[in-house]
């Protein structure tokens, strides 16, 4: 660079000197577009509305919580496993008594 201001002439770009793994790649060259039948199959995933009644996770509360979800069979089973093992729902009153990150 000569002078106080940068000009386009100050930059020289030598793409031929780049390593093969750094060279630009046409991102569409290896892409396969799904046909219409595959697209329809993806949109036809069966979802069902479920009503879930679960007790509040706080030991001193006796409130039953009711939530509604729209899920696949796999999704509702995963949620059921979480509710049985690691996940506990809290009512708004018990949530107000909790601190962020724990009780």
UniProtKB/Swiss-Prot annotation:
Keyword field: Activator, DNA-binding, Early protein, G1/S host cell cycle checkpoint dysregulation by virus, Host cytoplasm, Host nucleus, Host-virus interaction, Inhibition of host innate immune response by virus, Inhibition of host interferon signaling pathway by virus, Interferon antiviral system evasion, Metal-binding, Modulation of host cell cycle by virus, Oncogene, Transcription, Transcription regulation, Viral immunoevasion, Zinc, Zinc-finger
InterPro entries named among the record's database cross-references: Papilloma_E7
Gene Ontology CC terms: host cell cytoplasm; host cell nucleus
Modified how: Highly phosphorylated.
Cellular localisation: Host cytoplasm; Host nucleus
Ranges spanned by the short sequence motif Nuclear export signal, renumbered to the chain: 76-84
Molecular function as annotated in GO: DNA binding; DNA-binding transcription factor activity; protein domain specific binding; zinc ion binding
Superkingdom of the source species: Viruses
Keyword check for Zinc: yes
GO biological process per UniProt: DNA-templated transcription; symbiont-mediated perturbation of host cell cycle G1/S transition checkpoint; symbiont-mediated suppression of host innate immune response; symbiont-mediated suppression of host type I interferon-mediated signaling pathway
Pfam families in UniProt: E7 (PF00527)
Motif mapping: LXCXE motif: 27-31
Keyword Heme among UniProt keywords: no
E7 terminal domain as annotated region, ranges: 1-47
Coarse class of the protein's main subcellular location: host cell
ZnF locations on chain (unnamed): 56-94
Assembly notes: Homodimer. Homooligomer. Interacts with host RB1; this interaction induces dissociation of RB1-E2F1 complex thereby disrupting RB1 activity. Interacts with host EP300; this interaction represses EP300 transcriptional activity. Interacts with protein E2; this interaction inhibits E7 oncogenic activity. Interacts with host TMEM173/STING; this interaction impairs the ability of TMEM173/STING to sense cytosolic DNA and promote the production of type I interferon (IFN-alpha and IFN-beta).
HAMAP family: PPV_E7
Protein task: Plays a role in viral genome replication by driving entry of quiescent cells into the cell cycle. Stimulation of progression from G1 to S phase allows the virus to efficiently use the cellular DNA replicating machinery to achieve viral genome replication. E7 protein has both transforming and trans-activating activities. Induces the disassembly of the E2F1 transcription factor from RB1, with subsequent transcriptional activation of E2F1-regulated S-phase genes. Interferes with host histone deacetylation mediated by HDAC1 and HDAC2, leading to transcription activation.
Free-text comment on this protein's domains from its UniProt entry: The E7 terminal domain is an intrinsically disordered domain, whose flexibility and conformational transitions confer target adaptability to the oncoprotein. It allows adaptation to a variety of protein targets and exposes the PEST degradation sequence that regulates its turnover in the cell.
Family designation: Belongs to the papillomaviridae E7 protein family.
Protein name per UniProt: Protein E7
The encoding gene: E7
């Amino acid at each position: 660079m000569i002078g106080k201001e940068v000009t386009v002439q100050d930059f020289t770009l030598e793409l031929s000197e780049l390593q093969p793994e750094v060279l630009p790649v046409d991102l569409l060259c290896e892409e396969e577009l799904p046909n219409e039948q595959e697209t329809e199959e993806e949109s036809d995933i069966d979802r069902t509305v479920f009503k879930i009644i679960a007790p509040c996770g706080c030991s001193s509360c006796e409130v039953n919580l009711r939530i509604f979800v729209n899920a696949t069979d796999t999704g509702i089973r995963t949620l059921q496993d979480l509710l049985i093992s690691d996940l506990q729902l809290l009512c708004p009153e018990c949530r107000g008594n909790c601190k962020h990150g724990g009780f």
